[in-house]
Amino acid sequence: MLGDRICEELDRLSREGTPFEALLAAAVERLHASNPKFHWTGIYELFPDNVLRLGPFIGAATDHVFIAVGQGVCGTAVAERRNINVPDVSKVANYLACSTSTKAELVVLIRKGERIFAQIDIDSHEYAVFDAEAVSCVERVADWLAGAYERRRTTVSAAGRA
């Protein structure tokens, strides 16, 4: 499975000591390259002020560097605590258009239990491209990244007590 192969590569990079931010960028790169119909791929990190902030991404620049929880597909995914697969973004009332070319969007939360760390956001210029296989791949990578966020949080907390 493609998601497993991407996670194996992320495991290797992690064992080699790749910094956390570079692991996020590598995950974005691998996901983006995994499907020619993924036209914009990025990670938005959730901060304590309930704002999503854009992290590493591949694709056209976007004005949506900050997104409030509840706003657009990305903010709604966090507010509703669920992944969202939108086959046709024109049907979404509160859609935030990053590009007029975007036709479909997939948002997968990076979470451990109830704690949401971030999300993977993927846009496509084609309608209804996020089939079960694509969603499964992105979910697998999101699960791996959730573990990385958890390890980072634990390491940072332990370092603060030292």
Enumerate the language-model features and the residues they cover.
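A short, aliphatic-rich beta-strand micro-motif
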Residues: 104-111
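Regulatory sensory and allosteric helical modules in signal-transduction proteins
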Residues: 46-97
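Amphipathic alpha-helical "output/dimerization" segments
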Residues: 130-150
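Short hydrophobic/aromatic beta-strand element in the GNAT-like acyltransferase core
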Residues: 40, 107, 119
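Short beta-strand-to-loop transition segments that serve as allosteric relay/switch motifs
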Residues: 120-128
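Glycine-rich acetyl-CoA-binding "A-motif" of GNAT/NAT acetyltransferases
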Residues: 116
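Intrinsically disordered, low-complexity terminal regulatory regions
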Residues: 1-62, 140, 148-162
